[in-house]
Every structure is written in structure tokens, then in C-alpha cells.
């Protein structure tokens, strides 16, 4: 069922993420809401990010970690965190909740708060952030599209006996909190996870212990271990609530030739398992395309004589158009005004062309995209789109980066 955007109440709730790396992972969108919200609630991973939020906020700030306590059930803390934000929403304030990482990934109070706010008739939305998994992809250097990827929370994996796939990448979250419902993290139940991993992969298979660096002074943890190593007390002591396991694929998943033929893919079994570069973590059985094989050398040789397609479009927009689009992206209050009275905002913006005004007044992505791009020949000849052509423009699909060559 689609979420209704029609509300009759003044309070609003936005939930955002601060990412993992201190300050650096805060998006421009999140920063704009920090600057403009009446109330900013946060639970972040380091004091530098906390200071950055407080220094940039124009409203009042509140640290939600106050609701944690050593032997207190975490669920109770989450309910309280959610409710204090909702109280300000109900009081008519613009409320921002900032959570460590991605606000919707392994975060309970964010989803609860948004659902309750919407049920009560308030505007509520979530902004994306950089999760531990995003950071892990970058640091460990693998693409989940190659081999596929499964992702589980450690305790849930065990309790619900979720399937692990030896032919895919596997990510296991919160390995330092197996069976823990409070704030006491002693790894007392960690051996149960090791039993499961040994059963599915064997004792000699690789597991990478990962923790993304937070402060500028922090060092990223990327420790390559075997599953057998996980039974050593000195190793177990290294795991904490921010620890994540990456388990690379052990087995090759062979192509189904009959399906490959139906898809028009010839010689599927001879294709490399992955594009260059080879994984740092998988074994030698996984073949990889060469960095400079015959095909690569051939296409590289064509770079200097390459000519762009005649229908290739480049950025072509007035200074006013570019500034207004930037402001709409980074100024929540202006965006709200634009959506409430589009024509007034457009008319108040000087320097727009007739086509740009027409596109903006339609408040549709397709026309806006169309008037901001043009072919070099159209620019040289002074050809402009007609208003009818602008109105009929549709939003182009994003370019696809295909896995197989």
C-alpha cells in the first residue's frame, strides 16, 4: 500500500544517518536538516560527530544515549527514544533524529517512530546514510553483484536457522552481541555462532573481522582469520558490538547453460567468474578477467580516436537554474514552499529561461532533466526545446553498469 503524503498536522519527523566515519559520512541532505530543524535528537558513535551536530544545529539538541543502561533491556530503551521524538512532533515541531550509520539498517527506534508518526497523520520520512555494510564494501574491495551477497544479524541467523550460502558473499552483523538483549557484551554465546559457521563452511575457511574506522585517528580493522581461529580466547576478546564478519564464497556457482542460451549468452561456462581485480579473500579456484588481456588492450587503443555519439547530451543550464536546483536539494524549507506553491517560487527566481520556467512549473523530473541537458550541436545552433517537447519529456533511466562482459 502506498504511503499517504497528505497530512493535516504541523509537526514533522525526519530520520537521518550520520554514517560510520566521524563527520565525513554526514550527507549534505542530512546537514541541511540539522541546520533547519527545531529539535535534533541523535545517537552517534563518537564525540566529534556529536560536536558537529550541536555546532550546526539551530534548534535544541538531545543525546538519546541517555536511555541506555547496563542491565536495561535494549528494546525498552528504543521505545523511550522513539517516544521523546514523537512528543515534539505532536507539539508541532520539525524534528530530526540522527542515528549512527544508515538510520534504517539495524536501527529499531527509527522505523517505529516513522510508522507511528505517519499513523497519527504527521509527515515523516527517512534519509539514507552510509551503513557499516557500505563501508565494508569499500574497504574490503568486493562487489556484492559478483557471486551475490547474503546479510544476516548474528543472533537472528542462529535463532531462525537462516541459510548461509557457500557460493555467495556472506555478511554477519553484530557478532559481538550474540544472544545479548542488554548492554552487557561479554561474548558468552559467541561459540554458538562458531559452531554454525564451522558446520556450513568448515574450520579452515576464511572469515574477515571488520570494523570501519570512525575517528580520523582510527585504524580500520580487517583481520583475516580462519573459522578455527574463532575458538581462540585471544581472538574472541577482539570482538565487540561494532564487529562485522565477512565470509567470502567457498564454492563456484556454475552457470546454467540452458538458461544462458535462452538469455542469449554464449559460452557462459567459459566466462570469468568476476571482472578484474581478483578478490583479496577468495581462493585461487575463482577465475578473474585479466587487467590487460587482448580485449582490454584493443578497447584501450581506441580511446584516443573515440568520438562521442551525436545524441550525447552535456550539461546546459542557466546559472539560475543550477542554483535553484541546488537550493531545492539542500534547503528543506524552500522545497516545502516549492511543493506548496510551485509557481510562486519559480516566478521569484530571476534569470530562468522560458523552457526552464515551464519545466519547473510542471514539478516533474522528466522535464527538469530535459531542459538541463543538450547536445553540443543544439547548443552551437541555438536550438531550444519547445514547451510541448519539455512537457512530454520523461525521466531517463540511469546508466547501467553490467557485471558480465
UniProtKB/Swiss-Prot annotation:
GO terms for molecular function: methyltransferase activity. Residues 251-375 are annotated as: Clasp domain. Keywords: Methylation, Methyltransferase, S-adenosyl-L-methionine, Transferase, Virulence. S-adenosyl-L-methionine binds at residues 100, 102, 105, 132, 174, 212, 243-244. Its EC number is 2.1.1.-. The keyword S-adenosyl-L-methionine applies. It is an enzyme of class 2 (transferase). It comes from the Eukaryota. PocMA automethylates at Leu-402, Leu-403 and Leul-404 before being processed by a prolyloligopeptidase which likely forms a peptidyl ester upon removal of the follower propeptide, which then undergoes macrocyclization with the N-terminus of the modified core peptide. Peptide backbone alpha-N-methylations change the physicochemical properties of amide bonds to provide structural constraints and other favorable characteristics including biological membrane permeability to peptides. One of its GO terms (biological process) is methylation. Homodimer. In the N-terminal section; belongs to the precorrin methyltransferase family. Fusion protein of the methyltransferase pocM and a type I borosin core peptide; part of the gene cluster that mediates the biosynthesis of a type I borosin, a highly methylated cyclic peptide with potent biological activities. Type I borosins derive from the C-terminus of the fusion protein, and it is the same protein that methylates its own C-terminus using S-adenosyl methionine (SAM). The C-terminus is subsequently cleaved off and macrocyclized by a prolyloligopeptidase to give the final product. Within the homodimer, the clasp domain wraps around the adjacent subunit to position the core peptide into the other subunit's active site for iterative intermolecular methylation. This is Methyltransferase/ribosomally synthesized type I borosin cyclic peptide precursor pocMA. It comes from Porodaedalea chrysoloma (Phellinus chrysoloma). The lineage of its organism: Eukaryota, Fungi, Dikarya, Basidiomycota, Agaricomycotina.
